[in-house]
């Protein structure tokens, strides 16, 4: 009976000992996959922002650029002193970019420093927004199945939504 009670106490307290850490596993979120853009929206919304201001032809032309390795990001890095740091590379439509990144799992702060590329993209709507978003990124959200990079455009906070590209490791 005494052994039964001891086992019961261990079973009851085991979840407390292995409680989930609220800090993100930032390396698991960012690395090991190619992220492709799924949409760009205003924070709190989940529909594509209307960069085209109801110009359906321009919208359709932009959406045709969402193919192949366009609008993709690849992060490499390691965890150093509880902050993930590393390098990244990406591509809009005609513009490639690479540089350094760091992310803090405690407060979800994201810093992206572009070292090469990042100029004007061939698509003046989605391509421009993609590059602007990387340049002014300040936080992230998501997990290893969805990544949201938040950026400010004036007083408006927008985010770029990403999903892992098929056959990219996840």
Pin down the residues of each PLM region.
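N-terminal hydrophobic targeting signals that begin at the initiator methionine
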Residues: 1-2, 21
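Sec-dependent signal peptide recognition
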Residues: 2-10
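C-terminal motif of bacterial Sec signal peptides marking the signal peptidase cleavage site
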Residues: 15-19
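Lipid interaction determinants
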Residues: 20-170
């Amino acid at each position: 009976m005494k052994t039964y009670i001891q086992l019961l106490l261990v079973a009851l307290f085991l979840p407390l000992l292995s409680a989930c850490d609220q800090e993100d596993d930032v390396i698991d979120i960012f690395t090991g996959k190619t992220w492709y853009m799924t949409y760009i929206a205003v924070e709190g919304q989940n529909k594509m922002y209307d960069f085209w201001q109801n110009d359906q032809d321009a919208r359709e032309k932009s959406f045709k650029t969402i193919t192949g390795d366009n609008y993709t990001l690849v992060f490499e890095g390691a965890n150093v002193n509880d902050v993930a740091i590393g390098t990244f590379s990406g591509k809009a439509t005609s513009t490639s970019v690479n540089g350094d990144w760091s992310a803090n799992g405690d407060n979800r702060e994201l810093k992206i420093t572009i070292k090469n590329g990042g100029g004007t993209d061939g698509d003046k709507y989605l391509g421009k927004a993609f590059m602007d978003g990387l340049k002014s990124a300040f936080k992230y959200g998501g997990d290893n199945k969805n990544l949201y990079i938040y950026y400010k455009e004036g007083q408006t906070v927008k985010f770029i939504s990403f999903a892992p590209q098929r056959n990219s490791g996840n």
